[in-house]
Amino acid sequence: MMDAPVSTPPQRVVSLVPSVTESLFELGVGDRVIGITDYCVHPAEQVARLPRIGGTKNPDVEQIIALRPDLVIANQEENREADVVALQAAGLPVWVTFPKTVREAFNLLWNIMYVFDEPSMVERIRSTEWLCDWLERMEQPECKVFVPIWSDPLMTFNADTFAHDVLRVCGGTNVFADRERLYPLAADLGQAEPLSADDPRAVGRDTRYPRVTLAEVEAAQPDVILLPSEPFAFNASHIPVFAALDIPAARNQNIRLVDGSLLTWHGTRLARALNTLPNLLCPSKSEV
């Protein structure tokens, strides 16, 4: 995660990251935001009045340039390198963020405070950090969790992701923490031999989001299954697919729909995640 390429507090900001957009408003500097993506939906009332510059993967670079921002905030995973390069070539400072753990997300929030020179953020950030510290110190029984992020093909995430670390802090053990995505697709589904790590067709590929089978889910024996609303919009109609498996989550009716942003949005939404997810993962513990 690179440092912000500005020497004075920015006054005209374009955010290409939905979670950062929300954080800027909740930390008191939303009045400096002059452009956002189509996926920046929170806080709803405040963002409704702002210019939209396209999607996270297909922003209108010329429109961003025309807005004359003194800082563009992007994310290494959510935005395309080609768009970042184009904005930089036009002379715009671009801050590329990429928190992959909860602690790195807190570091980003502190960096936002320093970059925007807004000390009023301290109490908000520190209170969420204290909650995280408390959760990490708790002795928690193992709670094996499966979280799909796509339906067809069925996909999940491994330990090298922000969502995995959110689960960890909240008391969950990701059942596919050690599973890497294999290439080609047939190999990921156990139907062919995978390419070797040094094969040119596999080098540089993202291995953090493996495709898995229902048989693998059954073998992993999760205690809880969380069906998130994003990136794939799981709903009640998907519950029977997993309820039919011979797993503790099905037997104990612990297959739950969840707001996907609690797992994947870094930033101030962490406060909601840390207050909500532990109760979904270990309800008996939270009631003690």
Regions found by a protein language model. Name each.
Residues 1-288:
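N-terminal ligand-binding lobe of clamshell/alpha-beta domains
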